Amino acid sequence: MSEITKITAQKRRGRYNIFIDGTYAFPVSETTLVDYRLAKGMVLTAETVAQIKSSEVTAMGLEIGLTYISHQSRTSKEVSDRLAKEDLPADVIQKVLTRLTDLGFLDDADYAHRYIEEHLKMGELGPRTLQHKLQQKGLKPDLLANELAAIPTTAWLDAAVRAGQKNLRHHQHRAYKDQLQRLRVALMQKGFDDTTIQTAIATIDPQPDPEAESDLLKLEAAKQWRLKAKYDDRERKQKVKTTLFRKGFDVEAIDEVLDDLAES
């Protein structure tokens, strides 16, 4: 049996030092102090001391968890990973997660719902990408499947259209065919399905600009013609033609421009 001979407050608010039999024993939080009704003269068994220390570790974990989620919403896995960095025992981490969930500070379903809604309002990501991002945050596949299924197809279409319009603006100085190809690839990479991609492109309805494309072709052809000046005329023409074709320009238009360059 041991007796608490002194309790002193630390400089840190809400923290106290416990002295047993005249010797410093361990620190406790105010919560632990109140929960165990610790006071000078109280007699403690070895088992009680062990329980107090265990509770204090849990209280410390809870404090770390609360601080971590105070900056922004987190998933259970994110909090668990943060606590693990403090080398807290697995059972303590689970107690903290349970406590935070009971207090309403951890709710993976609500987190997923708000994350998806926020991205749909202003974002440009499709369901596949959002699912992948949320799975990385530790959310379960069945939970995500339910949340994503609840989103109307029109919402995904709006996001795809936003993404598509942004992509087209970025590549407006490219050949029309190249623009369309890059647009499709970009929407696929952002996680939209084929049906949504096709509908989004039809909604955006990008149109070619023959005059602008002709000017662009002439500039690009002249550039490539200079870059490949070391080849003989036949090989030079073929290499330039191949390059321009890969950039999405029309074959007949390429031939016309190359004929002009060859004659100049």
Curated annotation (Swiss-Prot):
Broad class of where this protein is predominantly found: cytoplasm
Single GO BP term: regulation of DNA repair
Subcellular location, record wording: Cytoplasm
InterPro entries: RecX_HTH_1st, RecX_HTH_2nd, RecX_HTH_3rd, Regulatory_RecX, WH-like_DNA-bd_sf
Keywords annotated in UniProt: Cytoplasm
A single Gene Ontology CC term: cytoplasm
Job description of the protein: Modulates RecA activity.
Family: Belongs to the RecX family.
HAMAP family with a match to the protein in the record: RecX (MF_01114)
Protein name: Regulatory protein RecX
Organism: Lacticaseibacillus casei (strain BL23) (Lactobacillus casei)
Record lineage: Bacteria, Bacillati, Bacillota, Bacilli, Lactobacillales
